[in-house]
Amino acid sequence: FEKFGLYAGEAFRNQGFAAGAVGGFMETARKVDLAWEPIPIIRGWAGASGPLTDETLAHFVGTITNALKRADQVDALYLDLHGAAVAYSHSDCEGHLLQACRDVLGDSIPIVLALDHHANLTHAMVEHCDALVAHRTQPHNPWETGQLAATLLFNILLGKLTPTIAWKKIPLITHQEQFLTSPAGPMREWFELAREIESLTGVASASTFPMQPWIDVPEGGWAVAVVTNNDMALAEKHANRLAQFAWDQRDRFLLQESIPPADAIRRALESDNGLVILSDTGDSVFGGAPGDSTILLKEMIRQKVQQPVLLTMVDPEVVQQAIVAGIGSTIQVELGGKQSGSYSTPVRLMVQVSAIGGGEIQAACIGRDTFSAGRAVVLTLGSIQIVVSETYGVGGNHPATYDHFGIDPSNAKMIVLKTASNFQYYADWTSQIIRVDTQGATMSDISGFNWQQLP
C-alpha cells in the first residue's frame, strides 16, 4: 500500500480528493445545497496480489473505526472499496470492515458504497450498507461511480431517498476475456440493461458484478444489486431481470477467444501494418499475477522475431545487476520467471543495458495520476526492448512506461500488455488485439485452478 499510495487524514485530502471515485464523489458533493464538511480518514491503494495479512486488515479497520469514534459528529459514511479483498483470516474483508463501521455508527447513520464491478458482493456487505453502486463500464470509470454514490448519499440525507436494496447471487464465474463493455458483446448488453433499469422511475441504482475470477471464497460468484426508493417489489423485479440475463447468456460470457503463444506471434508477424497488442492473459498484473512471465518472450526468441517489440518484466535482481553494470554494458541475465511458480521459468539472455530510470511515473491510469515502478532499466535484445522494473506498476499497460525512457510505442510492431482487458491507452496506434492463452495466475482456463471454497 505504501508503494502504490497510502494517505491518511489531511494527506488524503491533499493527495486523493481529485482522482477516482473519491474525486467524482467530491465533485458532485460540492454542488449539493447543504452545509457539510468531509472528514478524510484514509486512502490505501495496492495492486492485486495475494491475501492481506491480518495485521494489514486490522490496521485499516482500526484506523477507520477509531476515526469514526473520534469525530465530533458523523452524519454519513462514504466508502470507496474494491469489493474483492481477501485476508488470511477473512474471506470477505469489505463485509468485515462494514460490520465494524456499523457497530460504531449504529443503524441510523447511512453508509454508502462505491464498488468496483469486479467485487464479490456478499451478505455482510449488503446488510451493513444503506446503498451501493458499482462501476458502469469496463474499462473502469470510477469517477462516474463516485458521482452516483454522492447522489445516493446526499439524497438520503436530504430525505429524498429511502434506500431499499434487492440483490441476487448468480452461480457463475468466468474468465476475463468477455469482460469489456466497449465492443459489442454480452457484457455490454448486461451493463446496458442495468442502465435501462436505472433510468426507470423509483430506481436509484442498478449494479452488475462480474466478480474477478481468481478468488476462492465461500460466497464467490457474480451478483447484481438494485437500489430503489422504498420499493422492495420493484427492486426484486429488476434484480431478478439482471440475474436472469446473466444466467441466460452464460455460454456467451464463457466464450474463450485467446490462442496459443506460437499462433499469436505468427499472426502478429503476418499483420500488414499498425501496432499489434499481445494480451498476456495469464500474467495480468491487474488481476494479481506477478508480471514476470517469460512465455511470450521465449516464443519470440524461438521464432527469431526481427520487428520492433516492447514488453515489460518484473525482476528486481536483474534491475540491480543492470544498474551495477551501467548504461551501454552487455550482460548475461537470468530474466523473469522467478515469481510465476510452475507457470514460467527464467530465460538466459545476453542483453545490452540501454537506459536506467524508474520511480514515480506520471500516467492517468485506473483512477490514479502516478504509479511507481521502483527502479527500472531498459534491456535491449536485438529488436526487442524490455523494460525491467522492481515492481510491476501498471505492467506496461500504459504508454507512459515507455515514454519515461524516451521510447515511442507507436514505432513498435508488437507490444505485450499484462492485462486481458485494459487496452484503451494504446487505442490510437492499435491495428489488432490478440489475446494469448498463456499459463499463469490469471489464465483464462479457470477450470485448471484447484478450487476449494467456491460454492
Identify the function of each model-found stretch:
Residues W36-I39, D75-L77, I109-L113, D130-V133, ...:
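Structural motif
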Residues G50-T53, S89-S91, T122-E127, E144-T145, ...:
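Short acidic, glycine/serine/threonine-rich loops at helix termini
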Residues A150, N155-R195:
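Conserved anion/nucleotide-ligand pocket segment
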Residues Q178-G382, V387-T391:
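Hard-cation-handling environments
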Residues F1-A67, G221, A225, M232, ...:
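N-terminal glycine-rich anion-binding loop in soluble enzyme alpha/beta folds
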Residues W247-R250, E360-P455:
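Extended hydrophobic packing segments that form well-structured cores
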Residues F4-G5, L52-V61, K69-T162, D280-L297, ...:
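Active-site histidine-anchored catalytic micro-motif
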